[in-house]
């Protein structure tokens, strides 16, 4: 929609392939005609979904009775509004209040862990908690059946499974909250003695971050940013292991100066929001080391190889 040049997404997806990005998608530019009428230049890509050839995590099994009507429940911590900085842009957080809301029990495990709100598909059932996740960091989280908001206001929705159970949402939310607690710690360790890198594959997230920096993509960790997780569970349904993987790269419409929104503007007005994770990541030497190694290695090679590719593709776009 914002890709006025017609090359933004092509360049980003191709570079992501070049640097060995996690779950990098196939992409093919096409001229689209519908009933003989030219409709413009489109990119045909893989869909972001759980599959061995897409995002390779285990698909969950459900025992939901056929024909059960869909419904959503939203759970919100008491005094929800007081948890946010008064100078922050809260319009997206306020969306959590819309819809069916349940006053959480005092012993709700997710809220006790620091999660501020979450939603789940009430009709779904599992005999036993199982399966992996494709999560999207996105301020448009309320479009999905399952989502949660972390202690620092990061909004995360479930892309797969599309309709998660309460147990699935709680398990994933608690695990991500443990990661965030470690990320915000000066030492990088949370109260459980686990380092943030125990939860996060640093290299994979460094790839999506550096790609966003290079292309001027200001939606990083704000919208359309994917994380996937292949977890291990204990007998109580808690996630005990597995690393959040950055990727696949997606939605680079607003890159290469396609918009005048800048990181500095976003950060100054959204201090507790999604992009607050960026400043915390950059405080940790292992993340900046990963960026430097990538910048001087695989990324430098990708930039060099892309020069001819983009020029050639640009000529093709001009011809279209």
Regions found by a protein language model. Name each.
Residues 1, 18-25, 37-210, 314:
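Internal "kinase-insert"/substrate-recognition segments embedded within catalytic cores
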Residues 2-5, 37-39, 47-51, 140-142, ...:
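Solvent-exposed loop/turn segments at secondary-structure junctions
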Residues 4-16:
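TRNA-binding/sensing appendages of the translation machinery
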Residues 11-12, 44-48, 290:
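Alpha-helical scaffold elements adjacent to nucleotide-binding pockets in ATP/GTP-utilizing enzyme cores
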Residues 15-19, 229:
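Active-site catalytic microenvironments for nucleophilic, acid-base chemistry
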Residues 27-29:
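Short, acidic/polar N-cap/turn motifs at the starts of alpha helices
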Residues 158-222, 228-320:
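Middle-to-C-terminal accessory/interaction subdomains
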């Amino acid at each position: 929609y914002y890709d006025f040049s017609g090359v933004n997404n092509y360049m980003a997806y191709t570079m992501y392939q070049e640097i060995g990005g996690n779950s990098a998608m196939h992409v093919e530019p096409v001229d689209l005609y519908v009933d003989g009428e030219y409709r413009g230049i489109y990119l045909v890509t893989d869909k972001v979904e759980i599959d061995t050839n897409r995002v390779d995590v285990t698909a969950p099994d459900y025992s939901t009775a056929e024909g059960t009507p869909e419904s959503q429940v939203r759970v919100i911590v008491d005094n929800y509004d007081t948890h946010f900085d008064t100078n922050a842009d809260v319009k997206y957080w306020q969306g959590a209040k819309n819809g069916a809301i349940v006053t959480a029990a005092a012993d709700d495990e997710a809220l006790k862990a620091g999660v501020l709100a979450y939603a789940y598909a009430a009709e779904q059932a599992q005999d036993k908690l199982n399966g992996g996740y494709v999560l999207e960091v996105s301020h448009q989280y309320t479009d999905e059946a399952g989502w949660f908001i972390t202690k620092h206001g990061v909004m995360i929705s479930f892309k797969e499974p599309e309709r998660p159970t309460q147990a699935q949402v709680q398990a994933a939310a608690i695990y991500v909250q443990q990661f965030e607690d470690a990320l915000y710690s000066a030492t990088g360790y949370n109260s459980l003695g686990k380092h943030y890198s125990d939860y996060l594959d640093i290299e994979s997230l460094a790839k999506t971050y550096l790609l966003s920096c290079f292309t001027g993509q200001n939606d990083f960790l704000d919208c359309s940013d994917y994380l996937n997780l292949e977890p291990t569970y204990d007998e109580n349904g808690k996630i005990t292991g597995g690393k959040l993987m950055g990727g696949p790269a997606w939605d680079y419409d607003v890159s290469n100066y396609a918009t005048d929104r800048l990181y500095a503007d976003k950060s100054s007005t959204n201090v507790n929001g999604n992009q607050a994770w960026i400043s915390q990541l950059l405080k940790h030497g292992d993340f900046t080391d990963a960026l430097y190694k990538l910048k001087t290695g695989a990324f430098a090679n990708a930039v060099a190889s892309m020069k001819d590719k983009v020029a050639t593709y640009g000529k093709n776009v001009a011809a279209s």
